[in-house]
Amino acid sequence: MTQATNQTPGQDVPGAADVPAAAEGQGQGQGERRGGGGGRGGDRRGRGDRRGRGRDERDSEWQERVIQIRRVSKTVKGGKKMSFRAIVVVGNEKGQVGVGVGKAGDVIGAVKKGVADGKKHLVKVPLTRSNSIPTISTGRDGAASVLMRPAAPGTGVIAGGSIRTVLELAGIKNVLAKRLGSKTPLNNARAAMVALRDLRTHQDTAKERGITLEQIYS
């Protein structure tokens, strides 16, 4: 018995040998599209790496010094809850400095919180060419007060305790500072921050008075 086939005259029917070639071509096209997506993903990863390096470079500019770590307690209904308090000074030695306080159940957590708090309370310090302060300044916090005077190149940082730490991380190389009143490290550090915050350059003074720099120096 002869089977009839519905074949249009002049139309070629693809053979079995031609089918794998077409499937292979489709596979190559899909592979190329997948490869293109992988390339774009690689570019995104590259941009992420660059952003990560930028954050690391910014973080590396900051220096941290712990002034004091104390074990403190809080009386609650169930008794006393013990924790640690860390006083940290953060600065980039380029005219920016901050003092922060952190409390946590462990020392590392308290220091991390202190660093974050210090970066939230940064003060910009106007520095002279000799890395000193432009004018005399005083600061007060609680019972502690600090007096700062400009110094000539080569003098160094004449200060002690937490005040010295604040001045060094601010980038000041030549200054005379005197502590008056309380010896508490936190109050002294905050008094030093107030003195640095209230600093005014000669340009600021001339602008406030409405005169020129020549009139100030004369």
UniProtKB/Swiss-Prot annotation:
GO terms for molecular function: rRNA binding; structural constituent of ribosome. Residues 31-63 have a biased composition (Basic and acidic residues). With S4 and S12 plays an important role in translational accuracy. Located at the back of the 30S subunit body where it stabilizes the conformation of the head with respect to the body. Residues 1-10 have a biased composition (Polar residues). GO terms for biological process: translation. GO terms for cellular component: small ribosomal subunit. Residues 1-63 are annotated as: Disordered. The keyword rRNA-binding applies. Belongs to the universal ribosomal protein uS5 family. The gene is rpsE. The keyword Metal-binding does not apply. This is Small ribosomal subunit protein uS5. It comes from the Bacteria. Gene3D superfamilies: 3.30.160.20, 3.30.230.10. It comes from Synechococcus sp. (strain RCC307). Residues 11-25 have a biased composition (Low complexity). HAMAP family: Ribosomal_uS5_B. Part of the 30S ribosomal subunit. Contacts proteins S4 and S8. The lineage of its organism: Bacteria, Bacillati, Cyanobacteriota, Cyanophyceae, Synechococcales.
